[in-house]
Amino acid sequence: MSQTLSFVLKTHNVRKDFVRSVKLTLARRRDLQYFYNKLSRSMRAEACPSCASYDVCPNCTSSDIPDDGSSTELIPSWEEVTKTSTYSLLLSEDTSDELCPDDLANVAAHIRKAISTQSHPANSDMCKEQLTSLLVMAEAMLPQRSRASIPLHQQHQAARLEWREKFFSKPLDFLLERIGVSKDILQITAIWKIILEKACYCKSYGEQWFTTAKQKLREMRSYESNTLKPLIGAFIDGLRFMTVDNPYPMGFLPKLIGLIKPLNLAMIIDNHENTLSGWVITLTAIMELYNITECTIDLMTSLITAFYDKIGKATKFYSHVKALFTGFRTEDVSNSFWYMAAAILCYLVTGLIPNNGRFLKIKCLLVRATTLVSGIIATQKLAAMFATWNSESIVNELSARTVAISELNNPTTTSDTESVERLLELAKILHEEIKVHTLNPIMQSYNLILRNLMSTLDGVITCCNKRKAIARKRQVPVCYILTGPPGCGKTTAAQALAKKLSDQEPSVINLDVDHHDTYTGNEVCIIDEFDSSDKVDYANFVIGMVNSAPMVLNCDMLENKGKLFTSKYIIMTSNSETPVKPSSKRAGAFYRRVTYHDVATLVESHKRARPGTAVPRSCYKKNFSHLSLAKRGAECWCKEYVLDPKGLQHQSTKAPPPTFLNIDSLAQTMKQDFALKNMAFEAEVGCSEHRYGFVCQQSEVETVRRLLNAIRMRLNATFTVCVGLEASNSVGCTAHVLTPDEPFNGKRFVVSRCNEASLSALEGNCVQTALGVCMSNKDLTHLCHFIKGKIVNDSVRLDELPANQHVVTVNSVFDLAWALRRHSTLTGQFQAIRAAYDVLHVPDKVPAMLRHWMDETSFSDEHVVTQFITPGGVVILESCGGARIWALGNNVIRAGGVTAIPTGGCVRLMGLSAQTMPWSEILSELFSLLGKIWSSVKVSTLILTALSMYASRFRPKTEAKGKTKSKIGPYRGRGVALTDDEYDEWKEHNAARKLDLSVEDFLMLRHRAALGADDTDAVKFRSWWNSRSRLADDFEDVTVIGKGGVKHEKIRTNTLRAVDRGYDVSFAEESGPGAKFHKNAIGSVTDVCGEHKGYCVHMGHGVYASVAHVVKGDSFFLGERIFDLKTNGEFCCFRSTKILPSAAPFFSGRPTRDPWGSPVATDWKPKPYSTTSGKIVGCFATTSTETHPGDCGLPYIDDNGRVTGLHTGSGGPKTPSAKLVVPYVHIDMKTKSVTAQKYDVTKPDISYKGLVCKQLDEIRIIPKGTRLHVSPAHLEDFEECSHQPASLGSGDPRCPKSLTAIVVDSLKPYCVVVNGPPHDILHRVQKMLIDHLSGFVPMNISSDTSMLSAFHKLNHDTSCGPYLGGRKKDHMVNGEPDKALLDLLSSKWKLATQGIALPHEYTIGLKDELRPIEKVQEGKRRMIWGCDVGVATVCAAAFKGVSDAITANHQYGPIQVGINMDSPSVEALFQRIKSARKVFAVDYSKWDSTQSPRVSAASIDILRYFSDRTPIVDSATNTLKSPPIAVFNGVAVKVSSGLPSGMPLTSVINSLNHCLYVGCAILQSLEARNVPVTWNLFSTFDMMTYGDDGVYMFPTMYASISDQIFANLSAYGLKPTRVDKSVGSIEPIDPNSVVFLKRTITRTPQGIRGLLDRSSILRQFYYIKGENTDNWKEPPKTIDPMSRGQQLWNACLYASQHGIDFYNKVYKLAEKAVEYEGLHLEPPSYSTALEHYNSQFNGVEARTDQIDTSGMAALHCDVFEV
């Protein structure tokens, strides 16, 4: 609508009243918007639900609040509002009153006024951020159903929805960044909602969303400075102790000087240099000065280790670090050491990176501190600033997160069970985080707000639990029914039974009531008289209760909606023996779920004996012994009968006798039934790393058990010793003593020595020697001291305490923090400071504080035991994976000293015992030994390194000359001198190829290229050097006149610029003007004065296409008036005698690109639009290119480069992306046909055997018969051969299928549309392949300008095509074409020189060849596409040079067309294959018919890229891109896809297609796994292609996704298979035996050879080529002895490479052929054949034509091919 409006507003011919009405409407809307904004600034006082629906609400008519906050008639004053309980709750005062809607409305009204008016008294109490956050806090504290009463709730919700729509598609990094910088609480809440929503649906959006959400919920933006208070407090205490409280004040100054060592420190700082070596020297000197070198090295080691553990998960790490450092302001300081110290101090105090903004705020406060009073005031303001950054931001952040989570608790948002589970987990994490803040003393003033937030999250957690329970299977309860006469005591017995089943009070359900809000969900449920009402469907109710499916109860109260039935035991009573009739449809389901107990009592006998008298109390017993409980059998519908399984005769099966029980046994039976009903098979636990098995003989079990117990006592270990597989609960690992036959799912160790004397070895602390096991120190430490989880012990037993390794007396917080670092990992050390602070200052809460700290801390795998002696008591901490802690208020003296870590001795890796140890453990021991060696020399190594750096300061440095003297030197290395020319070469090479080579690398590469090295880099360098040499004349002599006088210089006319490959930019992201498509076919249309009006496009033969409003009036083209103008709507055509050098093809279809290559989005539906030139029927489209007046007439093209529409209008500056395109329509401009064409578009379509085609005037039949005959030597045994001549048609008994049917079946796949890869993926890969080939193929290869020269480059043994019968050599006289052929060539060449596309037509035939017998029986033959000789000549002239350049570099590039497989080239292939990590050999089924036209067009564009872009090239390009037309049997079929086998340059185009397909599949697979591809794929892997044959050499990354790569190839329409055509997935193959081009590339005793398939060699002896015949089983009448002898000779040479055994078999066949065929040939011996082949392979003797042919099995080509 907006684009249409823009066209309407530009139209001059529309009615004035319509324009006036539009203007008035827009003005009215602006006035209403201004009035609405004014009203929104004067906020209303009421919480009116209708306000959102009106611009001016009719209900809100109260006056505004005065500026001073005084009261009005309806609204109390600000002073009165602050006294209400609602305001107190918002300010977190101690009140439990609920939020009153009226009070909230009043508070909101004053807050609105305070925001807009500075004089309002609320501004003196709170800042504006606090005012705006109050309502958000209130929203977070209320349940979601109660938020409608909060003022501005609907506006807040709408704002959050708008922010959600804006940010929902943004990446995670962007959202996290916005949270960190945004100050808008509504925006932050919306972003949190997006993150949490995608985290709940991480299955669709990625697991990183859920992981990041869990991590970020535990983090806060603000820095809590109270963690530094213990540090500052300890510093103050230490300073007080050294000064005021020092008993020897005179000794303080010398001690302080001796501690600081100021002279040495000053000398170190004065010698500091701001370089890498300078920092190393300075820091090393300071560490050595204060004797902290060793501990600093250990700390740096742990930091680097943790950094490299986390860097793999970091995203955009480089950009973040770069942004951090580039954001700092450069300061003019003489020594950067003090600047660094100030920055670190600011970070430690404020917790904020000292960027420019924070420094400015602090600086503004400190600048005013000129006196003592102003200094105190400034300090107070700084403290207030820091407090505001901490507390307020924490509460606001928690409120935003709570609102986001509560709004996600909605079935429409989180719909499936997985999302509910993740939402539940996120809510629990946030609940725990808020709970932690409630324990913080600094946050006590906000405690009530935090508890209300926790209450809101409790509601979310409860709701999520309900929703999970509804969707999950539950335990099936047990239902017992007590039946008997009234008054027998059933209800009392049910109550007594309920008490024995559970300590809880039973839940009671009354089925006579519709709603069950009173149901409590306890374990036992009693339903008394469940069948008393006939109106209740009690049978289905019972079936629903006793079921594994969740049962939702019908409740009336809102908070009980979704309540589930959860009881385990159901006890029901009934007076009816059979409540459900056996004939009921639900009887089977009912009686299967319940168990009946018939209740009888002594009261009945008393009533019968004494009717009319009251029953005495003596008839009732407290233990219910007066009751008789008879348990019926299963499915007994009465006492006598059981339900019939068939449901027919229910009184046919007698019931078993009942079982009599009492109340106690009945309760026990119910518990057993419940356990039996809910019994399930559990999967066996996999191999556990906390279970250790010691395997010994049965007689040694007891001894090993005693040894292990002795080890446990000796080392005070935490593991538990068990005999057998059963394990008991343990705080650590479990050691199992096993026999060899017992299975075990843990780590196994074989005990090789076991006796009582080994106990003495324990005194030497060598556990492995005592047991005789090969066990690493890591495993031993893990076994003995691993702790599961985190345990806090409030009570202490001295015999359970571990021996201390460290005893720390805590005098300051530094002592505690430094000791805790031994226990924690790097991330856990930051929590140690807060725990130390809590232990020191709040000793009464030691267990709670340490429990929380331990839950949040990750402990190292090393065993560490530390005893802390603190003022509040003693704390003992033991950690190893987990942790145990003992905390006491009193001091405890712990004896036992310091223990040593158990070791395995120095001989445990010697002997055969090490064979059972994995390599990882052996290497771990090696690294441990190297670590010990390093620990002994690390300090001295660092000091010596720093000393050598210090000494190198005074060493003279070599400096290069010329341009490398100063700042423009090489990137790496020193002392390399370059001349000016060499420097220019180095810079140009790096810029042209986008490399970062150092000077040394560049000189080495240039040297290797000059010496003729054949590696890829050297070849590409030579190609670049040649291109640069051609540009040597790009200089111009100029005269420069300046202050220095007159100088003569040479300046470069071409600017050096790196080529932007754009591998990481998709086609859809490209924009901006560039080179126009079909620029050689586009001309300018001018008026009589020569001014430009628009463009036209040459269609050929002097016919041009344009748009009507451009050629309207007097129009000229190239200075000549246009004529013969014809229009069809806005599209028009005209003629001109001025003919452009090229022509563009036109087609009716949807465009994909605009004239400059940008993508086009359009529905391509012509509609009338109003423009400045009147009504125009066209199609609306959008592109990213901005057009200008005068661009009308430019072409819009499709994927094949065909023009489908012309530009005719745009939306102007307001909507520049809107375009109006006139689609192409056919206009008959023909005068007389100048060339023959079989396919006539004017003829009607006909259906021919299922094909849509055009009927021709002449009929060319498909040739019949075959020239293949059985050899006279094999008339009897020719059936032993695996191949036979192809099917001959309907008369062939092997397959009666006609030749026409075979051709039709072969053409049908070509008529199916194949889409191929996505367009943007294909475009990117095409650019990569062009860049890769640019290193081998030169640019601007000249096309052939001579028609006869191009014709002689063709193979004259092939067909002339559909316009001339026979082969080319049939029309040759003395080596030159005859008149018929010359006339045809001349007519086509004339059109090609004008850039006009030629008819793309082929004549169809069937290949006469040997085929496998099974394919002969199926009637499968390969088609021959006979290309028009004129088209072939034009294509040879255009692209033969480019094709030869590509094939000449087959040794380096991916295309192997032109390779000789019987030459040393095969050795180069083998070396390429051997260097790959994974090798895949792939073949494709139906390759030709599955080719996408878009891929073929991209390959043809690659050929055109390297050509000289002449009209001949344009004609060939447009011809080959047009759909091929198959001509046969008097019809012409236009195919939709596929690549004709007879297309010119088919091998090269097929190979380029192959490369593009594989590159697209790899690119799409990588980016599907979130790997952005910014590099050239073809530079990272190698491949060899020849048509459909391919060998892919993948690195590990690509091989890991090979399944996805081949799946993508299949999705493109291809059919990849194994080389041997076997069924199964394509897997890596052995690189020592790779099949390529029907050759097996492998190593033989003679070297690397390409072995021809044995069956191909053997069938040479069975068949001979002769005259055409229908009886191929008869020998030919004549045999050419020369050709046949050469064929058999070559077969013997190929057979010699397979070994002597196979050669002997071939030799016998050769002797038999010579005898029966009368050949003058003596078959060579094995040694002779081997010698001849090796000589020809190495180029010693001339190769025969057969061997010299490249490609497939070449030795029979002259004999068997057509």
UniProtKB/Swiss-Prot annotation:
Q: Name one GO cellular component term.
A: membrane
- SUPFAM superfamilies according to UniProt: DNA/RNA polymerases, P-loop containing nucleoside triphosphate hydrolases, Trypsin-like serine proteases
Alphabetically list the UniProt keywords: ATP-binding, Covalent protein-RNA linkage, Eukaryotic host gene expression shutoff by virus, Eukaryotic host translation shutoff by virus, Host endoplasmic reticulum, Host gene expression shutoff by virus, Host membrane, Host-virus interaction, Hydrolase, Membrane, Nucleotide-binding, Nucleotidyltransferase, Phosphoprotein, Protease, RNA-directed RNA polymerase, Thiol protease, Transferase, Viral RNA replication
O-(5'-phospho-RNA)-tyrosine PTM sites in chain numbering: 983
Protein name per the record: Genome polyprotein
Q: Which residues form the SF3 helicase domain?
A: 458-614
Q: Which Pfam families match?
A: Peptidase_C24, RdRP_1, RNA_helicase, VPg
